[in-house]
Amino acid sequence: MSLKIIHTADWHLGQTFFGYDRDEEHEAFLSWLIDILTLRQTDVLLIAGDVFDVANPSAAAQRRFFRFLREANRHNPQLQIVIIAGNHDSAARLEAPIPLLEELNTSIVGVVPRTDLCKIDFDSLLIPLYNKEGKREAICLAVPYLRQGDYPASKEGKDTYVEGVTRMYRQLYDYADSQRQPGEALLAMGHLHATGAELSEDDRSERTIMGGLESISVEAFNEDLAYTALGHIHKAQRVGGRESVRYAGSPLPMSFSEQHYHHQVVAFTLENGCLSDLEAVPIPLRTALHRIPAEPASPAEVLLSLSNLPLAEEGADRSLWPYLEVQVLLTEPDPGFRHRVEEALADKAVRLTSIIPSYPKKEGEEDSRPFSYTDLQKIAPLDMLRHTFTNRFGGDLPEELEKMFNDVMREVSL
């Protein structure tokens, strides 16, 4: 028999984008996803964390989530949904409605449960997956975002985060392997930063771990796992050259650095315990992101480009207007430039999000490199401010700003 599965992650319901809510975008995605689940007669939906954008999501975001679960079940009553918590989610809040959601064939793992003897309850992390005939086809190792202390301790009791998380997946795999029947597949879920995961150069939507101190090697996931469904990184990709270890990516771009990501869900089949028919299913984008101009240009050139944008039509749906980031090349700070941009866009069918200034490099100035973890331990805060100011504005830090910074440092040191 076979099991049809779809993997998604990083919905970030309730996110605001530079002050604009994204309700219509999320609603369009969820409606599309229900159609895909129904059309493909999907047996299992895996949601690999960051359902919500914040730990205390709005009532509207929670309603949207619960309404999706209800509608997905109504269109496909046999659909099984497995959800793990991400670092943006409140694990306890996500688990709170479990008694009700069990009626919708939905399993949620937010926290790592422990037994009365304070050992990890591995059974609670194993979710059986059934085919349309009600036969168990696979076992899912549903591991939520792990924090310090969530993973099994070593005998020495001195673990790095990477060692602890790796031990968690290996021990859980061994336990699940002992519980499965012949022909049953094992698959895993996780919300973490995997070693070698690709990001765009200016991606700041998820915290980049300094020096890779908390990135998990693909070797943590046993090669006999039929599939590993990951969340946390917003760029859809396979990891470590293994087709079966994947980030689904976010359904919406969470920042302008993600505007060229291929937003998708991953569909695949488990056939007699083996992975087959793996396919990336593109998600239609409701609202576009535009950077104008494509490269920073002078204020006059920027304003000329903005004047050529399409006019707004009376009664138009503003939620369909593209988000706009303006890039300008300045020789010195220009406090009035934003006002001129806003005037130029007053009758245009776009939504201004930000104006990003850049400054020409001084002659002989080399490209700056990011500070390493060791650098950050050695550099003084004032030196960091001076370095950042010079890189951003091309000049020395003004004395009045240095004085203000020193005053603040004295206050926080009291």
Predicted regions span which residues?
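N-terminal active-site segment of His-dependent metallophosphoesterases
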Residues: 1-70, 74-78, 407, 411
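Active-site neighborhood of phospho(di)ester-bond hydrolases with catalytic His/Asp-centered motifs
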Residues: 8-9, 45-49, 80-87, 107-112, ...
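Active-site neighborhood of divalent metal-dependent phosphoester/pyrophosphate hydrolases
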Residues: 12, 42-60, 76-92, 194-212
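Active-site environment of divalent metal-dependent phosphoester hydrolases
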Residues: 14-15, 53-56, 85-95, 147-151, ...
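Metal-dependent catalytic neighborhoods of phosphoester/phosphodiester hydrolases
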Residues: 18, 51-68, 85-104, 110, ...
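Conserved catalytic scaffold of divalent metal-dependent phosphoesterases
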Residues: 104-211
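Conserved beta-sheet core of the metallophosphoesterase superfamily
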Residues: 194-274
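Accessory, non-catalytic peripheral segments of nucleic-acid enzymes
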Residues: 270-414
